[in-house]
């Protein structure tokens, strides 16, 4: 039995989605493990939830919420490790693994991951760098391009540059991409702040709306395409559990269609694909996962055009676990039951933590061999001894 600390809520536009995902994860984990719930408010304050909240959740008598009891406000101890990183009411709480069921900003973007690294506790999901890269759609697309993966043509700009050169950017978008266009914040999930535009008139308002959610906006060519989602897990070797499909009723799969109770979007746990298409998409999913250095789990999304062209769209490092989320359904269809999936994710977290803990961090604790020392001696190599920045990016 593992002591799991489950984080949910968060200071994010996807707060409510996180709560719904956490409900599924908590109910699954509590069947085999000890679970401590920590709810994070929209203001970013952490509160440990009473044991009765978990009991009621697991028996299905109440929905998950966040009780803000100041006596149960969480204190964090950097370096506290599994025995003392989390302190509640003056008492340290044992935590074998943290499961951050957090979506979007301050959850999937490397911020919480960095905090958990400083606490020195294992956690489910990707590390700091991989989380940050995956959350930043611009950086992810650049890395995928460098790795030779297909992505839709795109343009991006910062808010300050947009303010100074608005008309130039509009002209650039019309020349390089052409209408219709798809506008979205570089760092936001669940289609928050995203919109499709057909002409110039709504373009500027769409960009301004996207800037409400991030300092960088990404604009790409809008395509009518099938939306294919692949579920992956592992630290290496990686597993592609399958490919599902989302059939949106609107211009695109927006927040309401993803999470509204009255959503009319259809999801197919097994996408109807030809064998060659399935192999192509799952191979690209593995390469996209590897290119960003992902670990634990992720959902990689694709566009499949009528012409047969396939484009990597984006990646989600903490996929939804709501009642309509494809990730757990794809895994279950592949023969991985929810309890087994949770066991795999906890195992990956502890495995990755052990591997990182084995790395050296103290230069003085090691005696380097003379040949190694000379190879890294600036005086021995001259002023330009460090050539790492000039090395080309590896291609998959």
From Swiss-Prot:
Coiled coil segments of this chain: none
Residues annotated as binding Mg(2+) 1: 301, 314
Molecular-function annotations in GO: ATP binding; D-alanine-D-alanine ligase activity; metal ion binding
Locations listed in the record: Cytoplasm
Residues the record lists as binding Mg(2+) 2: 314, 316
PROSITE patterns noted in UniProt: ATP_GRASP, DALA_DALA_LIGASE_1, DALA_DALA_LIGASE_2
Top-level EC class as recorded in UniProt: ligase
GO cellular component, one term: cytosol
Reactions the enzyme catalyzes: 2 D-alanine + ATP = D-alanyl-D-alanine + ADP + phosphate + H(+)
Record keyword Cell wall biogenesis/degradation present: yes
Keyword Magnesium belongs to the record: yes
GO terms (BP aspect): cell wall organization; peptidoglycan biosynthetic process; regulation of cell shape
Pathway: Cell wall biogenesis; peptidoglycan biosynthesis
Pfam family, one: Dala_Dala_lig_C
InterPro entries for the chain: ATP-grasp, ATP_grasp_subdomain_1, D-Ala_lig_Van_CS, D_ala_D_ala, Dala_Dala_lig_C, Dala_Dala_lig_N, PreATP-grasp_dom_sf
Record's cofactor remark: Binds 2 magnesium or manganese ions per subunit.
Disordered: annotated span: 374-396
EC number(s) from the headed UniProt entry: 6.3.2.4
Record: residues binding ATP: 174-229
Listed HAMAP family: Dala_Dala_lig
Biological function: Cell wall formation.
Record-linked NCBIfam families: D_ala_D_alaTIGR, PRK01372.1, PRK01966.1-4
Family from the record: Belongs to the D-alanine--D-alanine ligase family.
Protein's UniProt name: D-alanine--D-alanine ligase
């Amino acid at each position: 039995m593992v002591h799991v600390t489950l984080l949910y809520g968060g200071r994010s536009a996807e707060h409510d989605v996180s709560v719904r995902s956490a409900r599924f994860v908590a109910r699954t984990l509590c069947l085999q493990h000890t679970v401590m719930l920590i709810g994070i408010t929209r203001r970013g304050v952490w509160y440990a939830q009473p044991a009765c909240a978990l009991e009621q959740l697991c028996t299905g008598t109440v929905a998950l919420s966040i009780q803000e009891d100041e006596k149960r406000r969480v204190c964090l101890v950097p370096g506290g490790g599994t025995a003392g990183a989390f302190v509640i009411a003056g008492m340290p709480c044992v935590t074998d693994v943290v499961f951050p069921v957090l979506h979007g900003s301050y959850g999937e973007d490397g911020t919480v991951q960095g905090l958990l690294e400083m606490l020195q506790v294992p956690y489910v999901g990707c590390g700091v760098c991989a989380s940050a890269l995956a959350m930043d759609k611009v950086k992810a697309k650049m890395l995928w391009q460098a790795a030779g993966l297909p992505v839709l043509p795109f343009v991006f700009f910062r808010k300050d540059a947009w303010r100074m050169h608005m008309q130039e950017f509009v002209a650039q978008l019309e020349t390089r991409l052409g209408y219709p266009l798809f506008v979205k914040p570089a760092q936001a999930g669940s289609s928050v702040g995203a919109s499709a535009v057909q002409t110039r008139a709504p373009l500027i308002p769409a960009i301004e709306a996207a800037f409400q959610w991030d300092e960088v906006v990404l604009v790409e060519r809008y395509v009518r395409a099938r939306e294919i989602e692949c579920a992956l897990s592992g630290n290496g070797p990686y597993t592609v559990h399958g490919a599902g499909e989302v059939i949106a009723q609107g211009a695109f799969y927006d927040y309401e269609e993803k999470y509204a109770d009255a959503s009319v979007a259809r999801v197919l746990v097994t996408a109807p694909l030809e064998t060659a298409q399935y192999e192509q998409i799952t191979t690209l999913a593995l390469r996209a996962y590897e290119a960003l250095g992902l670990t634990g789990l992720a959902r990689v999304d694709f566009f499949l055009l009528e012409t047969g062209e396939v484009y990597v769209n984006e990646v989600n490092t903490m996929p939804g676990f709501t009642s309509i989320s494809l990730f757990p359904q794809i895994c279950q269809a592949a023969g991985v039951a929810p309890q087994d999936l949770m066991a795999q994710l906890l195992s990956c977290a502890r495995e990755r933590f052990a591997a990182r803990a084995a790395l050296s961090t103290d230069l003085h604790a090691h005696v380097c061999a003379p040949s190694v020392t000379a190879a890294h001696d600036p005086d021995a190599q001259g002023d330009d001894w460090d050539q790492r920045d000039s090395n080309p990016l590896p291609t998959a």
